[in-house]
Amino acid sequence: MASDLEELRGIGKVTAARLQDAGITSAYHLAIMNPEELEEMAGIDPVRASRIIMEARRVLKMTTEPVNALEYEEIIKENPRLTTGVTAIDELLGGGLEPGAIYELAGEYGAGKTQLCHQLSVTVQTFDEQLRGKALYIDTEGTFSPQRIRAIAPRFGLQPEEALRNIYVARVETVVALEEAVREAAPRLLENDSIRLIIIDSVIALYRAQFKGLEWLARRQQRLNYVLDWLKRLGRAYSPLYLVITNQVLTEMTPTKPGAALRIPAGGNIIAHASTHRLLLRKAGEKHIIRVLDSPYLPYKAQAEFKVTSEGVEDV
């Protein structure tokens, strides 16, 4: 709220009102902005913007002070993992999803990406009381299904209405709306409600549809990078926060094997560098396979099997 901002040194009622009008309603939200964004959104001079951002970070003790690797290892170990509800996938991921990391689920239509996202929206509600949270599901393709949540919830001991009440759905149809959802709506929800999971399904769809042609490629990649950068900022500032994006795939011919083709994630180097863990999903008969494409510590090409049933995503 404006009163929260006014408590920061260097921010009076006028500046607090300008920030609030721009959608920046708390010290936490202010602390993860950069000066150029404040100039664009609230008309604040970059030099002054830099000062008030640093003040917000100081008050919130958001330090960049390095720690030794042993201490860092302990911090990571203490992070609670989010279960997928599938033992084989949890084991593949080292115990479930880690907070702050971006998990990319890439695959063709019917590979199981959206099914897994729906299930994660439910499992995030099954933590113990202290960590139990809600989900923000940013839907760019109209694939979110309340009926699917109703079918999955009882398997995890939740009433369907309760599970649905704990999932916020943002249906976005333009790149601008997606950016607003991540930069403005998400921080507000994180401040005012116990959001523990953000899903973007799919992260690439709007960019491929609305930036057509090679002449728009550089602009498209810049805008895509901006949204992914905001996800990272949110993950660092509002821990524990779990981050999942889905991605489409492209067909790439292999020069060494004429007639053969590879399925590779769309989005180029931007998504490749932004994602912490890249996972490729595919359907194989009656079962589905999830395979590690890239990760800081998960074994390359390690995989797990799962099936999609009327009650969600399950072990084979």
Labelled PLM ranges:
Residues 95-97, 127-131, 158-163, 188-193, ...:
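Conserved catalytic network of the ASCE P-loop NTPase/AAA+ motor domain
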Residues 132-215:
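Conserved inter-motif catalytic segment of the P-loop NTP-binding fold
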Residues 1-7, 16, 61:
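Long, low-complexity intrinsically disordered regulatory regions enriched in P/S/T/G and acidic residues
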